[in-house]
A protein has these predicted regions:
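A conserved ligand/cofactor-binding region detector
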Residues: 2-824
Length: 824
């Protein structure tokens, strides 16, 4: 008799069923009892109980996709900053309140158990968090999708602060197992590296290339189910772990080489050991290229396996069934890898293979910074991926001859600029150029960014392919970034606009009509106050610093980079401190400046800025002369779970990058959605946030993109601003003293040098005066509680555009051409 298909209704648990399931897993899965179980055991038992729901729905999703032979998007990203999944999965399965009650009857707090979960920190910042939001939205909107990345053993480092300095520690996020992932040994892939290429006669008489690998690595897949909101679709994030093909040499071991016998195992496992190994050395560069190829090759093989399971070796439908999105340049090598598989392994002719590959790939550009558009030396490519270099040469030759020469005949300068190969003392492979040439669509991630991609970064490519370039403004999932992280505000919105807003964020716009309503303002600001009070306790526990929820909470949380200009925030705080020292009665509302940031291990100036922030904090926070009007807090080990505590409590959102440098930003969206007011430049998504909320509800300052170009074009001299502004000069000169580093003068001088002798490449000094005035405006607004509440409410209510569901729908309509697949 056929098994009856389970519906969503059949799968839904009540409180007693969930409680019984948790206790059962505590005993049978974890082998412990209620009396002696640790909080971690209770958390894992809860996850196991929830996984019964997750895997049932995952199986149903996969069976439906297979049966309907759906077109799917395969999202390749070196980063997936997933954070914690317990709360997220419970919300998406509509089980959060049920679980809270079930655990309450067992004498447990769900929020306490959620704290047992380590962050899945497989990313560095916005790039990885965007990928996580996108796969959430794909599942929520019922689109068939697979995320592909690397199963890093350590992910991003755990940041400790010692004497003000950043110290990197390994982040062993799965040291004791992760209940949300499952290993799939049946889908292991074998990946070749090194070796040489031989030209031989094929079976049909033509010439054929054979790559004889010098070494092979195994890619072991770990699947993390991605539960869409409502629990209908459960897609997967597949992460690849590297292992040796032959990880133990018995002969060497028996001959006494106990350590050498495991050398291959150690070398292979290094590939998926850490996110972004330091590439200052040749060995580091080689490891990073291998890391990128490893996950791309595993993913392409897996995509081929899935396709062949239905279509065999008939590739006529490949481009109609498969879409691959390259999230930045890290997965670029997937393009020559697919060509290698189609031409060398499947015997397809070049033109047919290129036609398929070109249709399949799309590329998202995330940066206008030249150093972030990766380049690899030709010699390194030749050593590690000899066949891929040949394929890149062929792609390049055909592109230059067939497209560039007819368009710009005899123009060698244009050819040199557009070529995938950069000529010079050290010849290099330009991965950004390869992405554009090998993809059918290229998108930027905010309107201003996409305009600059077309006009400044890739103008000739845009001229060749005007239809190729498009925009998809980034977004964030409101399920995590409002429903889960700010439950009080979520409940208020449920009462006012109904419970559909997590799927239709535009519904919040109807709240604007309450922006002047005194009763609603009181409710809204009471919730903000509660969130600030919670953060006060977190700050005390994490840093030992006492702050008051009465103060303005001014928050800058993002990775540390000069273009993001934490140094501008720093020197403004120093200026405020000088004003207070000069006049203890200086009229300002008490302010707490909160930073959360990690610097790349090899980025010395970024680490110096962290050190300066902490040294400033030590001095300011303990100076009784300023009567507690100014506090500085650096929250160590910034991560998704910490962001979920900081964002609901933020009054002011610092989005102060140099105009033209921040592609989009998503922290700006999250904080505005939670009722923070943006102080920012006209850069990235700030422009669109100001359009949605109204420029009068944001504190916009500084040079715009055109003014930045104009100033740089005229010849920017930071000394002009240094000598013209006595306050700015005094602040910068402070860095040379030992005021913040007693007995060690000049320890902070590198920051001043970067802003003066270093040419201040990100125009920090040029924007200082305008930034200072914008902060005075913030201060004035905050002193008028009704005005501030109105602006905060409008900011929150008008962020509907920045739902990642809208972003995904734009990708579907403009690039991927997917159809939703209803499950059940």
């Amino acid at each position: 008799m056929a098994t009856k298909k389970k519906t969503d209704q059949d799968l839904q648990l009540d409180k007693d069923q969930l409680k019984a399931s948790i206790v059962r897993h505590l005993r049978s899965t974890l082998g412990t009892s209620e009396q002696k179980a640790s909080p971690e055991a209770w958390w894992k038992a809860t996850a196991a109980a929830v996984n019964e729901q997750v895997y049932e729905r995952l199986t149903r999703t996969q069976q439906t996709h297979f049966k309907k032979d759906t077109r799917a998007i395969h999202y390749l990203s070196a980063e997936f900053l997933m954070g914690r999944l317990t709360s997220n999965n419970l919300h998406n399965l509509s089980l959060y309140k049920i679980c809270e009650e079930a655990l309450g009857e067992l004498g447990l707090e769900l929020t306490d158990l959620c704290e047992q979960e380590p962050d899945m920190a497989l990313g560095n910042g916005g790039l990885g968090r965007l990928a996580a939001c996108f796969i959430d939205s794909l599942a929520t909107l019922n689109y068939p999708a697979v995320g592909y990345g690397i199963h890093y053993e350590h992910g991003l480092f755990r940041q400790e602060i010692q004497d003000g300095r950043q110290i990197e520690r390994p982040d062993s996020w799965r040291e004791y197992g992760n209940p949300w992932e499952i290993c799939r040994p049946e889908s292991v892939q074998e990946i070749p590296l090194y070796g040489y290429v031989e030209t031989v006669f094929g079976d049909k008489g033509g010439l054929k290339k054979v790559w004889h690998a010098g070494r092979k690595i195994k890619g072991v897949p770990w699947d993390i189910p991605v539960v869409g909101f409502g629990g209908h679709t459960v897609n997967i994030l597949r992460l690849w772990e590297s292992r040796a093909s032959e990880f133990f040499d018995w002969d060497v071991f028996n001959a006494g080489g106990y350590i050498d016998s495991q050398a291959e195992k150690a070398q292979a496992e290094t590939i998926s050991k850490v996110l972004y190994p330091n590439d200052d050395t040749d060995a580091g560069k080689e490891l990073r290229l291998i890391q990128q190829y490893f996950f791309c090759a595993c993913s392409i093989k897996d995509i081929m396996r899935r396709y062949k399971r239905v279509h065999g070796s008939d590739f006529g439908n490949f481009a109609t069934q498969i879409a691959i999105q390259l999230n930045d340049t890290h997965p670029t090598v997937a393009i020559p890898e697919l060509m290698r598989v189609l031409v060398d392994e499947e015997g397809m002719d070049w033109n047919a293979a290129w036609d398929i590959s070109y249709q399949v790939f799309s590329y998202t550009n995330h940066t206008l910074l030249p150093e972030a558009l990766e380049k690899w030396s030709v010699s390194l490519f030749e050593k590690v991926l000899p066949r891929h270099l040949e394929i890149i040469y062929e792609i390049n030759a055909r592109f230059l001859n067939d497209l560039v020469e007819p368009k710009w005949p005899g123009n060698d300068a244009i050819k040199a600029k557009l070529s995938i190969i950069e000529e010079g003392t050290v010849r290099k492979v330009r991965m950004g150029n390869l992405c554009v040439i090998g993809s059918s669509k290229v998108n930027g991630v905010a309107e201003i960014h996409s305009k600059l991609v077309k006009e400044d970064l890739f103008p000739e490519y845009a001229e060749l392919w005007p239809e190729k370039m498009c925009n998809v403004t980034n977004g964030v999932t409101p399920r995590r970034w409002l429903l889960a992280c700010n439950p009080e505000l979520a409940e208020l919105y449920n009462e006012v606009v109904g419970k559909e807003w997590p799927l239709q964020l535009d519904k919040l716009r109807s709240v604007v009509k309450f922006a002047d309503d005194k009763a609603f303002q009181k409710q809204f600001m009471t919730i903000k106050r509660h969130n600030k009070e919670k953060l006060v306790k977190v700050i005390k526990a994490e840093t030992g610093i006492d702050v008051s929820a009465e103060a303005i909470f001014d928050v800058q949380i993002k990775r540390l980079h000069e273009y993001k200009r934490q140094q501008l925030n720093l020197i403004h705080i120093m200026a405020l401190y000088r004003r207070l020292l000069a006049n203890p009665d200086y009229d300002m509302h008490p302010r707490v400046f909160i930073f959360g940031s990690k610097a790349a291990p090899g980025y010395k100036l970024a680490k110096d800025i962290i050190y300066a922030i902490n040294k400033l904090a030590e001095r300011v926070n303990n100076d009784v002369r300023i009567q507690g009007k100014l506090k500085v807090v650096f929250m160590p080990n910034y991560r998704v779970s910490l962001a979920e505590k900081l964002i609901p409590a933020a009054d002011v959102s610092e989005q102060i990058s140099t105009a033209g440098y921040e592609a989009s930003g998503t922290g700006n969206m999250k904080m505005a959605l939670n009722g923070a007011i943006t102080i920012g430049t006209l850069d990235g998504a700030n422009i669109e946030i100001a359009e949605e909320a109204g420029a009068e509800n944001c504190a916009i300052f500084g040079l715009n993109v055109d003014e930045v170009k104009s100033l740089k074009g005229r010849g920017y001299n930071p000394y002009d601003f240094y000598y013209a502004n006595s306050e700015l000069k005094a602040v910068l000169d402070w860095f040379d003293t030992d005021y913040f580093t007693p007995g060690r003068p000049g320890e902070l001088s590198s920051i001043k040098r970067s802003l003066l002798e270093g040419g201040d490449p990100y125009l920090t000094l040029a924007d200082f005066a305008s930034y200072s005035e914008a902060h005075k405006l913030i201060d004035t607004w905050y002193r008028d509680p009704a005005l501030w509440a109105k602006k905060a409410i409008i900011n929150s209510a008008t962020m509907g555009k920045f739902n990642s569901d809208r972003s995904i729908q734009d990708y579907v309509d403009r690039i991927w051409n997917l159809k939703p697949c209803s499950i059940g």
